[in-house]
């Protein structure tokens, strides 16, 4: 079974407590995470990908301790950042996609061939020689997604992927996410993006405020946010 197991995790960042004894098991194919700024959403997905290491406890994804086994984590879980410019390293599209594959152990020629195959599969065979900085925001977001898909992870996590995108581009990315074979964890401020999801986590101040099906969690979340807006507390 595909599973993310978060066991008794305590996390502090810059001297501030984020999570205390957090325990979760995630097995659903489509999981949404909502919450206000500072609730711990981004910290949670960085824990799941192994980008941050907890002071206590551990995170295991499909049997891989993601903080202890970085090589294993690369083939198990991928993360699409909110801003693609925080993710793109190389100036040329082909090299950007090939980089992660080389980190997994592929030889340079095999990694480049795999990059070309991924581009072709996504209808972007003509992108290989393009400079990353010439791509639009939405195109750079797609490049980051293709780089993740090339790694063939079991889980793909998305941290506010629709921010700064115009509506047509956001809808295009949303459709691509919906069509993914991988398990998906999506962080968003927009509950409408979570239609058809299997499970919703509502984070509040580093704790789980609610956890369950969208029909149960999202109305409570929306009502709470509306109440805060009326009170001028947001």
Curated annotation (Swiss-Prot):
SMART domains: AAA. PROSITE patterns: ABC_TRANSPORTER_2. Residues 1-230 form the ABC transporter domain. Disulfide bonds: none annotated. Pfam families: ABC_tran (PF00005). Keywords: ATP-binding, Cell inner membrane, Cell membrane, Membrane, Nucleotide-binding, Translocase, Transport. Part of a biotin transporter holocomplex composed of BioM, BioN and BioY. BioMN complexes can be readily purified, but not BioMY complexes. Only the BioMNY complex has ATPase activity. Required for biotin uptake under very low (pM) biotin concentrations but not under higher (nM) concentrations. This is Biotin transport ATP-binding protein BioM.
């Amino acid at each position: 079974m595909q599973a993310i197991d978060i066991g008794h995790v305590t996390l502090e960042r810059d001297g501030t407590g984020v999570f205390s004894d957090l325990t979760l098991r995630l097995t659903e194919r489509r999981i949404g995470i909502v919450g206000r700024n500072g609730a711990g959403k981004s910290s949670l997905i960085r824990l799941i990908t192994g980008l941050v290491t907890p002071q206590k406890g551990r995170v295991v994804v499909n049997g891989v301790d993601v903080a202890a086994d970085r090589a294993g984590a690369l083939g198990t879980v991928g993360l699409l950042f909110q801003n693609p410019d925080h993710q793109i390293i190389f100036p040329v599209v082909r090299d950007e996609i090939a980089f992660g594959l080389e980190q997994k152990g592929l030889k340079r020629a095999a990694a480049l061939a795999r990059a070309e195959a991924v581009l072709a599969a996504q209808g972007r065979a003509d992108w290989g020689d393009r400079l990353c900085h010439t791509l639009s925001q939405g195109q750079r977001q797609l490049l980051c997604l293709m780089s993740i898909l090339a790694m063939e992870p079991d889980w793909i996590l998305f941290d506010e992927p629709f921010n700064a995108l115009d509506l047509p581009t956001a809808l295009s990315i949303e459709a691509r996410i919906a069509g993914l074979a991988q398990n998906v964890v999506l962080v968003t401020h927009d509950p409408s993006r979570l239609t058809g999801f299997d499970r919703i986590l509502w984070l509040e101040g580093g704790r789980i405020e609610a956890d369950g099906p969208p029909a149960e969690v999202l109305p409570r979340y929306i009502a709470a946010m509306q109440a805060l807006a009326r009170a001028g507390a947001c």
